[in-house]
Amino acid sequence: MFSIIFSNPVKPFNSVIIHQIRFFSRDPFPNKVQHYLYRANLIDSIRLSLRSPTTSDRTLASLLNHRLLDSFVVKNALRSSPSVSSAWSIFKTLSHKSPRFSFETETLHAFATVLAKFQRSSELNSLIGVVNAWKFRNVHFSFMNLLNLYATAGDFDSVLKTWDEYRCSGEEKKGCTESYNIVMQVYMTLGKDSEAVQTFDQIINEGGIPNSRTFTIMIEHLVKLGNLDAAMKIFETLPLMRITRTLKHYSVLVEAFVDAQRFDEVKTLIAEMKSDGKFPSRRMLEPLKRMREAGFEHETEEFLREMLPDERIKDISMYSMDNPSDSEDEGDEYKDDVNEAQVKLKPWLDPKALATSLKKWSSDAVTALEEANFVWTNLLVCKMLRNFRAPETAWSFFCWVAIQPGFTHDAYTIERMMAMLARNGQVELVDKLISKVRIEGIKLPFSTIRLIIDLYGISKKPEAAIKVFNEDRTLCGSISDFNLMLLYSSLLRTLTKCKRNAEALETLEDMMLTGVSPDIQTFSGLMYHFALQGEIQTVERLFSMVRQIGLEPDPYMLKLLVQAYCRCERSVLAYRVFQDMKDSNLMPDRETKELLVKSLWREEKRKEAAAVEESYEEENDNKNSSNVLRLALKGHVWTISSTDISRVYNLYRDCVLKTST
C-alpha cells in the first residue's frame, strides 16, 4: 500500500512526447507534468542503460546527447548510478561528447555524492580540487558540503580538518547545529566516546540548539555501547523538550530492542509511534517480521500489511527513448526475446519535482497526470502534500486523488493536508476535514491535534485553536495527563503569539483547576511574553505560582527574566533577578551579563552595573565556572529547560564514560 510507483510501464508515454515535439518549437511540452514525465522516462532509460550488460557505450552516449537533456536529468541519473564506474561513464560522456551540456552546481554535487557514497576518497578529493580551482565557473563547495561529503566517504581526518577550518573562517559565528552533529557522529564512529560527549557539550556552551538529529546520534551512541535503557530514557525525555521524535529514533530503538528480545519495550515504541503519527520506515521491516515470528502477530499486523510491496506496481525493463514501444503488449513481447537475467527496476519518481510540476493546477495537467497511470499510495500522497507550496493546489490535489481508483485517504494523508491548511489559516477547510474524520470514525494521532493548534499560532487564528482544543481533541482518543499538559502548553503559546493575553491567563487558570500542572518551560514562555509586554505584576504573579505548585525556578527561566526586563527598560527588576541568581550560586552567561550592564548604564544605575561586573570578575578569578549558566539556547523559550538538558547531558556523559572505562 505504501510503495511509490507507476501502475504501468511508462513506455507508451514516450511516443506521445516525441510526437508532441514536432508541434512545439519553443516549449515541446504543453504543461509541466508532461515535461516531468518526459524527464522521468529519460532518467529511467539512463538507469537501465547503466545496468544492462548488453547496452553499448553508444546507447548511453545517444541518451546523454539528447537535445532535451538538462541538469535535472543528469543530477538524478548520477544519483541513481549503481557504481562509481557508471557515474564516471556519465561524467566522461558528457565532458567529451556532449559539448552543449554545461556542468552546474547540482550536477557536480550529485557526482561528488556518488563518489562519497562509494567511499572513493582520492577521486572525491580530485574533484573537489578541480572545483575549488574554479574549473567549472561559479560552482563551489561550501564547508557544510565538504563536511557531509567527507563524512559519507568515511574520510574522518578530513572531516575534523574541515571542521577546524570552518570554525576559524568566520563563515558562521560558531557553526550550525548540523556541523556539530557531523563531528559528534564521526567521534562516535571512531570510538572516541569522550570527544563525542564533549561535542554535545560544545553545542550547549556555544549557544547552539540541539535538534532531532543530535539526539539520534546520542541514542545511536548509547545503543552501540549497549546502554539500551539509557537510550530509552533519552527518547522519553524528548517530548519534554518539545523535540520531534523521528522515524530514525524509532528505527534505531525498535531494531535494538528486537535484537535484545525485549518485546515489551518494542510494543511501547509501536504504540508511541502511532500516537506520534509515524509510519515505520523500511529499516523496521525485518525487525517487525522477527517480532511477529516471536508470537506478536497482533501488535505487528497493521504495520507489516501496509509495508508489503503493492502488487499493482510493475517493473520497468529495457526500452529506448529513441525507439519506444507503442503498447504494453509490445513491451511484453519484447521481454520474451531478451535474456532471463534482464534488468528490471522500479520506475524513477521524485514527489517533490512532480508536486512542483502541478504548481498551476489545470485540466491539461490533470489529464496528463491521469494518463501517467500512477499508483497512488498513501505514502506517495503524503510526500506530494509535503512538497506543495500553495494550499489551494494542495487542496485541489487532495480532492482529486480521493476519487482515484484504489485510493482512500487515511490519518497520515489527512494530517498532512490539515497541517498545510492550518499553517495558511484555512480554518473552514480544516473544519471540513475534521467533520469528515468524525463522520467516518477515523482516529487521528495526538500529534495531529497538537500540530494544528501550534500552526494556528503561526497563521494567527486563536479562535480556531481554542475550538480544536475544546471540541476536537477527542478525535485522538484518550489523552494522558502528560500529553494534555503538552496540548495546553501549545494552546497557551498560540494565544500569546496572537496577543490574546486575557484568554491565555484564563486558559492557564482552567489548566490548573483541572489538575494539570504546567511545566517550567510553559511558565518561562508566559513570563517572558508578559515581561516583554511590560505587565510586570502578571510576571510576578506567574513567578509566585511556580513555587506554589512545587516547581523550582529554572536557571534558564531566571536568565529569560533578566533579558525580558532589560528589553522593556526595567533594569532594576532585572538586577533583582540577578541577585537571586547570585544567591543561588548561579551566574548568567556573558551575553546576558553584558545586556544587563548596558541596561543599567542606560538607566543611570551605575552602582548596580559595577556590582554586576565585579561579581562576574570574582567568578572568573575563582577559576571555577561550573556555576555560570552555560545555556544560551536562543529561540527555545517555550521548549528546552536547563534542567532537562542538564539531565540528558549528565545521563549521556555518565553512561558513555562508565562504559569507556
UniProtKB/Swiss-Prot annotation:
Keywords for this protein: Repeat
PPR-type repeats, residues: 139-173, 176-210, 211-245, 246-280, 410-444, 445-475, 484-518, 519-553, 554-588
UniProt KW Repeat keyword: yes
InterPro entries: At5g66631-like, Pentatricopeptide_rpt, TPR-like_helical_dom_sf
This protein's record includes keyword Endoplasmic reticulum: no
Homology family: Belongs to the PPR family. P subfamily.
Protein name: Pentatricopeptide repeat-containing protein At5g66631
Species of the source: Arabidopsis thaliana
Phylogenetic classification of the source organism: Eukaryota, Viridiplantae, Streptophyta, Embryophyta, Tracheophyta
